[in-house]
Amino acid sequence: AYVETSPEKATEELLAINFLPENYSSLSFSELLAVLTGNVLAEATTRQAKDAKLAEFAVDDQTDLAAFLLDTPTAITASQFANVALQLLGYHPNYDYSLTDPLTCGEKHALPAFKDLTSKEELIFAFYRLLNTRSKNGQILLDVMAGKGYFTQFWGEGKFMLFNGKSLPVFDTSQVIREVVYVQSDLDTDGDGKGDLLPVTVFRPVESQDQLKVPALYTASPYFGGIIDNVKTNHNVDENLTDATTWTNPKYVAKPLVKSPAPSGQDVPATELATGQSSYGLNEYLLARGFASVFSGAIGNRHGDGIRITGSPEETISQKEVIEWLTGDRVAYTDRTRRFETKASWCSGNVGMTGRSYLGTLQIAIATTGVKGLKTVVSEAAISSWYDYYREHGLVIAPSECQGEDMDKLAEVCQSNLWDGGNFTAKKAYEAEQAELLAAQDRATGQYSDFWESRNYRHHADGIKCSWISVHGLNDWNVKPKNVYKIWQKVKQLPVESHLFLHQGPHYNMNNLVSIDFTDLMNLWFVHELLEVENGAYEQWPKVMIQDNLEADKWHAESDWANDLGQASLYSPTADGYLSTVENGTGQLTFTDLGGTEFKKAGISETDWEYQFISGEKKWAKASLRFESEEFLHPTTLVGRPKVQVRVAANKTVGQLSVALVDLGTRQRLTATPKIFARGNQPFAYRFEADSLQEFVPDKATKAKLITKAHMNLQNYQDMKQPSKLEAGQFVDLEFELQPTYYTLPAGAKLCLIIYSTDQGMTKRPLETEDYTVDLAGTALLLYRK
């Protein structure tokens, strides 16, 4: 995130933040070195206190900084300055590095190169670069200073301050305004004849109370009002498959509209204090830097009106209406009486969006409306089609660790206004809506329908007018990677600035990873998009950045994420269990699917089952066919979406087929989730919220790792959107894509293709066994290899 800066500009910025004293030109080299080093020590509040602390820093293995300065040096060597710099950055001499070889430590941690400093000009620029360098705690040194109170000297000035293109924490976090308003919707989802009131929580700098207008970071969070725990009532998945031709193509039916009044000239200050807490670290970080943080769950949320209708156009409309209030185009009231209007007069009219999972999903939904004022989205782990979240290729497919969840259950989780005991209108309407969702989502057949079509945001991507950042985990089996892959294929073709980050996590945030300065990049991004400052953000990093699965500190810069990043390679499974690039398969092989019976007997978790299954444990072998490649002689990277063709017959008139690609070979792999190195060690500002430094690290050796997988209903052999009759013993040709990937197989690894039926963590788990016969002559795997 460091923006290349001229020495002249660096000097100007250092003067502006009172780091470089006005009289610097009259100071000697040694005096300036003492002052600049002392200024980093923000916890020392007087010059005497700062000078006293200089003796705590070693220049080499014999001399402390105070003693070094007594000789009034006119220069400092690269090694000496590196020692001082590393200690200022939080590294411990003799523990983290040797005082006799600090340059090696700098190289190890990818710090800027140190050099001999022989003039005051070089010294000043070296400190400018140092302030922009990441410390041991993962933050740039300037942010470490902020956590110690350096920028409290600017509290109350009521203006943004920028440094290296990024906003500084100069806003008084001890006096943040926390308020609630009620936006009136055009929707009447609870059927009471009035527009639903949508509670909106605002956290904004106290400085915005006067003349300063600030941009807003809006997080559309259905969870903000609270979460109703209903896991125990999730749908039963231990049931036999249903004939998909009973499908009736459930329709989407729009809710009635009640036109809201236009905003008047009235503007009464908010009268309700916010008791809810910000739930997103990036927002808190940027709140201290002048960006208001706005949260709303919209329809169905606590203290508000309406009914949660998961993924529906109504959900999109209600969340969009919050932005319309922020830009002055919609009415909001101080309370539920609807008597006094209140405006977002503090807002500049520039809005960005943040959030992960459902919160990221609603960014996509709102962006497709092209709503005025929305300048950018940073959408993490987002659903781009609800069918791709709860279904796949004609099957009911659960998100990871959410077996039995569906649209109706998620709506219940987020219907927090049910906790408002007096809201009898919501309760009655909610029960009716639950019945409608249960019927329309069609858990019996799993087929695509008009209901799901209305919940596919990708079909409205042409409406996107704002800049775009997508963030997703390549190992996210909750919101599976094709959600981001398929919206990316749309967005990259639009005339908007767009970027993509892919990390090695599951359903996870990446803003505090050691290996990338993501938070600083987002600071730079939002300054450009919402403060409208030309700071080079668009050119600062590549179009696509992908974290390596072998070395967590390596990120690949790519121009795109698509099949054409690689070359097509065709593999054929053979009767003797090989996955071959030179031999075509012949003959037929049969496996017996056991449904969920053996899994239930084993009494293990879905995660444990998956590891045992992909590792090839014998007790699961009967329920699959496995084909292994030869060992790879060189590292090989798979990109894009693998495709399989399987000619298969089942001994029943229904069937489900699953396919997995697995990396085989006992070795250390990265942890599934990042390891936290120090909890709460990254303060966002002075005496404010904090985050924890973390990263993926090598874990204990494992036998196998899932690369990607997919599932398909045998009855969709003719059409993915139209089921057909299936006869017992009838061979059908299935062709479908697996989840997209970017995965490097190291030398010595084997690639394994597994063909099976019941996926215990995702598919239904039939109560009966079923035989599947695969015709190898009609079966192949297409990969894209870099």
Curated annotation (Swiss-Prot):
Q: Where is the active site?
A: S357 (charge relay system), D476 (charge relay system), H507 (charge relay system)
Task: List the coiled-coil residues.
Answer: none
Biological process (GO) annotations held by this record are: proteolysis
Q: Which domain of life is it from?
A: Bacteria
Q: Which Gene3D superfamilies match?
A: 1.10.246.70, alpha/beta hydrolase, Galactose-binding domain-like
Sorted alphabetically, which SMART domains does this protein's record hold?
Answer: PepX_C, PepX_N
What main location does UniProt list? cytoplasm
Q: Reaction catalysed by this chain?
A: Hydrolyzes Xaa-Pro-|- bonds to release unblocked, N-terminal dipeptides from substrates including Ala-Pro-|-p-nitroanilide and (sequentially) Tyr-Pro-|-Phe-Pro-|-Gly-Pro-|-Ile
Catalytic EC class: hydrolase
EC number(s) on file:
3.4.14.11
Q: Which GO terms describe its cellular component?
A: cytoplasm
The record's HAMAP family line, in alphabetical order, gives: Aminopeptidase_S15
Could you describe the subunit structure of this protein?
Homodimer.
Q: What does this protein do?
A: Removes N-terminal dipeptides sequentially from polypeptides having unsubstituted N-termini provided that the penultimate residue is proline.
Family, similarity comment: Belongs to the peptidase S15 family.
* Name the record gives this protein: Xaa-Pro dipeptidyl-peptidase
Q: State the organism named in the record.
A: Lactobacillus delbrueckii subsp. bulgaricus
